[in-house]
Design a protein with these regions (language model features):
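N-terminal, positively charged nucleic-acid-binding surface of large information/translation enzymes
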Residues: 2-174
């Protein structure tokens, strides 16, 4: 399989841009379910040997776009998780999102131009409806940010269980 990829993207023959090669690789990983196969193989081997490695990955705030610092930390965390997985340990790779109030609220206030708390009360027909509307905008903003982060993680090759990700606003988590 690896040889096939290397031959397909030989420098001499390749007419594709780096971004197209990147997208082809992401599509290949998704189509062939590479992470799922890796995880299944790793977990079955680790269960037999009863070896686990615990790693508590502090979840990022879902309140904006990832920046260079997030990407660097992700490389380090991913390297640690892959290292211990390849050493035969069971490594849980579940993602989580910190969605607690203040960072999300500040992000949304800046995004929609709210200058004071009084501006929030102008969003609806009364105070209750206004706060409800603001909370809905914040919640939708969190999902937008999570989608953006997920795409970034895929682009840098960071593996993780995104399907079973938790968020601090889920009742199951609370």
């Amino acid at each position: 399989m690896w040889r096939e990829i290397v031959l397909k993207y030989s420098i001499m023959e390749n007419k594709k841009s780096l971004s197209q090669i990147e997208q082809d690789l992401i599509n290949f990983w998704d189509k062939e379910k590479i992470f799922e196969k890796f995880l299944k193989n790793n977990l079955s081997r680790a269960k037999a040997e009863k070896k686990t490695f615990s790693f508590f990955d502090g979840p990022p705030f879902a309140s904006g776009s990832p920046h260079y610092g997030h990407i660097m930390v992700s490389f380090i965390k991913d390297a640690v998780l892959k290292y211990w997985s390849l050493r035969g340990f069971s490594v849980e790779q579940t993602f989580g999102w910190d969605c607690h109030g203040l960072p999300v609220e500040l992000y949304v206030e800046k995004k929609i131009g709210i200058k004071s708390k009084k501006d929030i009360f102008k969003l609806g027909e009364n105070e209750y409806k206004s706060i409800e509307k603001f909370n809905e905008i914040c919640k939708n903003s969190v999902f937008d940010c999570i989608d953006e982060w997920h795409q970034m993680f895929k682009r840098i090759g960071r593996w993780g269980d995104f399907k079973n990700a938790y968020s601090t606003m889920d009742n199951k988590y609370i």
